[in-house]
């Protein structure tokens, strides 16, 4: 079968499109015919060797944490699934990924794919959806009626976080570039502002806020200034550069290390199917272009969430 692999860490050039053996499912495993995976920034960091201590992957490595596909074969001791089922999953961060025609997945990680969108587009949901969910509801402990600032709302995690927060009854201010403004308004954000000018301070965007989500990589001194956007007794939850806590103001801080969670993913799928959660796919590209997609991400040319369609 065809797969994307790298045999050593490095730039996007280490990614190869090559033939490898089709895997055979063992006990508790499911062989999935991949429809698509998607690019996530963590794929870039793992490939570059920047996360070898946190996420130790064996070389050669097939990337692709997100999976959307169809069950092709069941291993022993697998129940609740049948050949032909459409499924999605967030694969373990250190496992062989879905940038291939077939992939082995732990049976417990698989959930039924959304019925109301194309299967390839469903690959854009798992990792970013779980990141948004866990940041909002586990780290920030979001409650109805709270004010929320999403910094980096134009990205894949940000767009889902805005929708989830609005659905939870929060008053959401979304900070993002102008090309995302109409989409974010459509998601129900009470206020959409441009990229934050930290020199202007929180009052310029209607702050401070009870909850701050920082989804943007910024310098540590900028993160310290961003803490001013959190109201006394509030929380700053980050998927990127952490915002420091301020005990004197009872400002709590937390950072995400996303994990797979089938129950949460099932809930996200249900919200997609009932129209409460919209997935924005900016580009669909063939798997063979994986190296170019990684290169585009590194140079800022990627238009947004990109799914990679298997052959």
Residue spans for each PLM region:
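Glycine-rich beta-strand-centered segment in the early N-terminal region that forms part
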Residues: 21-39, 51-94
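NAD(P)H dinucleotide-binding glycine-rich loop of Rossmann-like/cofactor-binding domains
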Residues: 56, 89-152
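Generic structural signal for buried aliphatic residues
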Residues: 87-88, 148, 212, 236
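Glycine-rich cofactor phosphate-binding loops and adjacent beta1-alpha1 units
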Residues: 173, 185-254
